[in-house]
Amino acid sequence: MKDIGKIILITGSGRRIGKELVLGLSKIDKNYKFILHYNNSSKEVQSLINKISKDGISAKPIKFNFLETEKIESFAHEAEKLYGRIDVLINNASIFKAKKFNKISNKDLDEMIDVNLKAPFLLSKFISSQMVKRKNGKIINFTDSIGVTKTWKDYSHYCISKGGLETMTKVMSLELAPYVQVNSIAPGKILKPINSSKNLYNNFYNSNDAINDIVNTVYLLVESKFINGESFKVDNGESLT
């Protein structure tokens, strides 16, 4: 049977890093096929599909709200049906909001944990079961230098969610080995957050260089055979300060 190329599911693919991953990876390997998850960015995803399809790249959209955690198993099955399998899962979708620790409500905490930690956990659980059966698969979790190596004031619930995702990466890499490799990427200050009232990005690094390095790191992990349980900091050394 002819190999149809790796099938890659990217969550939060319509904007920011997710969008750049689609654009970058589609240039590196024309055989990749993409499942593009979105929630509120249908126009952006369709525009992205139109753009890469001009180069012969196949991509299919799928809408889902990760706050509906009880429906993630159904979402995973629907995503797998689009091409018949998923070879690579990239957990990229996340919420980034500032709020003082003593002002965080139960709803604030639940939403942050549901989208940034619980959703990747459940999605990885359901999709990896098929990967294990096929004895092949990759999972890449996008964490953050915030919550992994350092913390920011007023972002406690965000830091907790990303720190938990980093720990989850290591646990999954042990439990799913040797057939599924699980790694994480922890970007630094790359793209200014949307609607952020905090002036945290005065000294953020060259976005183009950072995005290129992130895309190349993802490509390395997609194609690697012997990298498992690692966290790749792509932050120009920011986490050392």
Positions of PLM-derived features:
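Conserved NAD(P)H cofactor-binding loop of Rossmann-fold oxidoreductase domains
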Residues: 92-97, 236-237
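Canonical Rossmann dinucleotide-binding motif of NAD(H)/NADP(H)-dependent dehydrogenases/reductases
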Residues: 2-35
